[in-house]
Amino acid sequence: MNLLIMGLPGAGKGTQAEFIVKNYGVNHISTGDMFRAAMKNETEMGKLAKSFIDKGELVPDEVTNGIVKERLAQDDIKASGFLLDGYPRTIDQAHALDTMLEELGIKLDAVVNIVVNPDILVDRLSGRYICRNCGATYHKIFNPTKVEGVCDVCGSHDLYQRADDVPETVKNRLDVNIKESAPIIEHYTELGLVKNIEGEQEISQVTEDIKKVLG
């Protein structure tokens, strides 16, 4: 089985990716893992990627695409299939993936898209706060302090939010993700591959829904 998994930050993609890999025995391919392996093994594309990273420059699409193709050409993919996570990030990368899969003789079976209302994601992602005194982390919804405004660990009243976790910053980050992912989802929808999964349910129910669509 050859799959893509998509979903906005905070949608629970990582949890469901773990389930899919364990349940269906496919190879979990994340962008970060691919880059690290290619550079460690000094593949042609890995060396190219390292040259850009060492200069502090963004790795161009053709190099990223090349690293993905190197990984998809390996024997374990032919044997067990894959779950691609974190790629494609742009519509150009999606078209490049179509081409490389065709060249490798690999068929994409489904795109699992975990759908959550962005407003809910803002609450999920912007709820984190930290004790400045001891570093304990909390979440206003999922892991609140026992007494509001007081750290459970050290009793400090000095709790703060990182700039990255402020609602406005989170919303801006989600807006960028939505803009980039919308044409990719539209592309795979036209190909009849998208399986939309309601991600606002309990984690176990999201997992059950994925099992239903993948069989």
From Swiss-Prot:
Stretches for region NMP:
30-59
Q: In which organism is this protein found? A: Lactococcus lactis subsp. lactis (strain IL1403)
List the lineage, top down: Bacteria, Bacillati, Bacillota, Bacilli, Lactobacillales
| Gene Ontology MF terms | adenylate kinase activity; ATP binding; zinc ion binding
Sites binding AMP sit at 31, 36, 57-59, 86-89, 93, 162, 173
Q: Which domain of life is it from?
A: Bacteria
- Check the record and name the PANTHER family matching this protein: NUCLEOTIDE KINASE
Q: How does it assemble?
A: Monomer.
Q: Which SUPFAM superfamilies match?
A: P-loop containing nucleoside triphosphate hydrolases
Protein's pathway: Purine metabolism; AMP biosynthesis via salvage pathway; AMP from ADP: step 1/1
What is the protein name for this chain?
Adenylate kinase
InterPro entries in the cross-refs:
Adenyl_kin_sub (IPR006259), Adenylat/UMP-CMP_kin (IPR000850), Adenylat_kinase_CS (IPR033690), Adenylate_kinase_lid-dom (IPR007862), P-loop_NTPase (IPR027417)
Q: Which residues bind Zn(2+)?
A: 131, 134, 151, 154
Q: Gene Ontology cellular component?
A: cytoplasm
